[in-house]
Structures are given as C-alpha cells and as structure tokens.
Amino acid sequence: ITNSDYWDSKEDLISPAENIAEGPAPALIEFKNEISEIIWLVSQIKDSIDTMSNVIICRNRATIVLLRMKLSQKGVHATIIDKDQAGFASVKGVYLSTFHAAKGLEFENVFIPFLNEGAYPDSETINSSADQRSALASELKLLYVAVTRSKYGFFMSYHGQLSRLFPSTSSNYQIINGETML
C-alpha cells in the first residue's frame, strides 16, 4: 500500500526493524463477482469464529449492513463496532467496522472485502473533492489504518478490477485466485 502511486506520507512511515508478525502471509484474493466474494468471506469467518477475533473492515455502513445480513443468514452473529468502543483483540467472535471505527483496535484476523474499482476508493468522495490526488491519498491512508489492525491473519479481497490505489505489483502480499477456494 505504501508503494502505491497515491501514497504521499513517506516521511511519516517508519519501517520495521524486523518482521515479528506470526501467521500466514497477507493475501489479496480475486473473485469474478460479488457473490463469490461474499460466499468465501462468510466461509472464512465461520471457520475461525470460535478460535479467533475476526473483523471485517468496510468502507461504509451500507456494506456493513449487507455483510451482517449475509452472516446472520448463516447463523453467525456479528457485532458492529463504533469508534468509541474498546479493543476486541482477545474476544473471540466476529466484528464489523468501518475504516474510521477500526482505528486503534487490533484483531487476530482482519478481512477487507470489496477493494474493487468502483467501490474503493469511494467515488462520491473523490468526485466531490477539489483535489482528486489528495482525496485518493486520503482514501489510501484509510486503507493503511485497516491494514495495520491485524495481529495474525490479513485478507483483502475484490471482484472485477482491483482498485487503482493498489500498486501494480507487490511482494508484500500473495495474490490468490479466490475461485479456486470456493
């Protein structure tokens, strides 16, 4: 993410001296459509609900409502986090959060779905800004906040075309064809 053309805060970035995170390599998972992406996401959450704290971080409340409904249909209760709540890192279960509300919190597994062009960055935010490059940089900073919430597993997903905010190549995460995981 910090290798994106839109990242403009290199002076604020502190590179780690060593990699201390445990768990699988971060993953960027591609799907053909939204339905496949949701099926995979719900399946992953169901598999780890009893053993880890899981958060799904979304761009907006409408997406949170959609995912809460999809999880509920599969018998999974998800708690919606607001920005004034305390951390949940040691509490097993499923949480839904916006980028803003996740700031300062940590979870064992972090899922960030719908990182496809058209959904992320938020087109309304970009189009209403006088300075589009600055608006894109702000959207990228929100994503950076979400990325840094994980203590163990970190999974990003999208369907269709990947957001322009991502660098065209990166060695920081593995790219996976999600259709093979269904």
Residues covered by each model-derived region:
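A short beta-strand element within the Helicase C-terminal
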Residues: G93-T125, F155-M156
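Conserved helicase ATPase core of P-loop NTP-dependent helicases/translocases
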Residues: G87-K92
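C-terminal accessory regions
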Residues: L115-L182
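Short, contiguous acidic/charged loop-to-helix segments that flank catalytic cores in large enzymes
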Residues: R59, D84-A86, S129-A135
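Helicase P-loop NTPase motor core
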Residues: I1-I80, A86
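Structural motif
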Residues: K32, C58-A62, F99, L115-N116, ...
